[in-house]
Amino acid sequence: MAPSQDLGERDQQQPPAPYPADLENGRYGRIPNGHGSTTGTEGSGTLQLNEKDDATLRPNGSHDVKEEGQETSTNVVDWDGPDDPANPQNWTLSKKWLNISVVGLITFNVPLASSMFAPAVPQLLQDFHTDNASLSTFVVSVYILGLAAGPLILAPMSELYGRLNVYHVGNVLFIIFTVACGLATNINMLVAFRFLAGLVGAAPIAIGAGTIADVTNLQQRGTAMSIWSLGPLLGPSIGPVIGGFLAQAAGWRWIFWLLAIIAGAVAIISFFVLQETHAPTLLKRKTNRLRKETGNMALRSKLDTQLPPKEMFLRAIVRPCKMLLFSPVCLILSFYSAFVYALIYFMFSTFSFIFKASYGFNQGTVGLVYLACGIGMLLGLGIQQLTGDRIRQRLADKRNGGDHKPEYRFPPMFMAGGLLPAGLFMYGWAVQHHVQWAVPLLGTLIAGIGICIISICINTYLVDTFTMYAASALAASAVLRSVFAAVLPLFALQMYNKLGLGWGNSLLAFVGLGMWPITFLFFVHGEKLRKNPKFQIKF
């Protein structure tokens, strides 16, 4: 009989995990090392799976596992060998990238809705007969609060019902609540439906990284994470350009009609293209099918935790919170990522007022201001793509015999961490002294380069470090990031009124300078920190 595998105990894990840790060359497949065992590394420890020589693989994908101390065997359903095409890790490259691209498209559409409405806020306030500046900012920010709450619910749902169902249901509900925003008759209705749209729209942000980890290996992951990360970064930059001209031409309600149309098109594409990637869900379906075909109700999935759905759901909700509270790696890097991401909305929430007052831009042209930061992010993506994997491989070959370490993702941040505050200084003081409008836009472009590279490097590092719990790690980061992005802009106008545009942006730049050393510290000491027994989390 084919070898069966017993999961060794891990110091960061106390009951059985929802699914095993990623192995070096495949997430759920077996990789014999020629010595009767299989090993794989993960950020905080080593996973060992010992094979028994007296087991043979059955043609239907199930095999007998005889647990130590037991006299009877249990029928366990696994993949049909390490090359099983049903395993998402073994999909063809075209199939992998098609699914990743569609997930990236959904991820782009959701942040697009967050800022597309920003240039139309003055028009909205006029229609609803209010001049409350804080309320105008909150109408934009409340959507981000929905994005903050969503991952805590949607990520656990994907573990219970699969990633595909969460994507599809999220797409449909997002369309419904977006249409409701366009039909709002008062500002309270608009705020409520904006929050709900953000809540259900958070699906790709909550589980997108998990989907990527499901289908990619180490060599493919950097590019895939760059594509996925571009949505949350570039969407907020492009949205105001479209929203500004659309509001000027057809009114603010048409912004929501357009978003609903785009979301509808994306939902249709997703319905026909996306496939399930969550291995526990796939093996559960295979188990149910084999039970019907064979009549053997004793069959169970190799990845079945045998936990009640309620307990699985609660554990999955708690896991991101535990990561933020007890993992310095997750907490510190998520805090850095949250600050960087919040800067996008901090600047964007004030562009309409600043460039109208200081440079006389109208409602349509002020939307173009947001594009400079977006161009910077595209440049940052190009730099990351050209340098990230090359530097990682060079460091692996030179320092670690060709083996990758998550810390090798950090070098592009050495430059990016300095570009971010430099761009903020340039933007703030150029606007303060009414320097020609191209100069402050150049500052936002430079800041955009830094924001993009920092965000991609941190996201990819978290996936490399918490491969088994990549979705939870990114959900934890997304929650903190969205809270920062929703709350900090509420104080933007007050800060600028007290400190001025020059010193106000300088304050943000000094905070960025203070965080810059985090990159170097993690590059040198990150491995010791994530492997320190004090910080091993038990789930």
From Swiss-Prot:
GO MF term (any one): transmembrane transporter activity
GO cellular component: plasma membrane
Compositionally biased region (Low complexity): 36-46
Major localization class: membrane
Keywords recorded for this protein, A-Z: Cell membrane, Glycoprotein, Membrane, Transmembrane, Transmembrane helix, Transport
Region annotation (Disordered) ranges: 1-85
Glycosylation site residues: N60, N90, N99, N132
Topological relation to the membrane, as annotated: Multi-pass membrane protein
Biased composition (Basic and acidic residues): 50-69
Keyword match Lipoprotein: no
Annotated compartments: Cell membrane
Membrane spanning stretches: 100-120, 135-155, 173-193, 195-215, 227-247, 254-274, 328-348, 363-383, 410-430, 438-458, 473-493, 506-526
Family annotation (PANTHER family): MAJOR FACILITATOR SUPERFAMILY, MULTIDRUG TRANSPORTER, PUTATIVE (AFU_ORTHOLOGUE AFUA_3G01120)-RELATED
Job description of the protein: Efflux pump that might be required for efficient secretion of radicicol or other secondary metabolies produced by the radicicol gene cluster.
Similarity-based family: Belongs to the major facilitator superfamily.
Protein name (record): Efflux pump rdc3
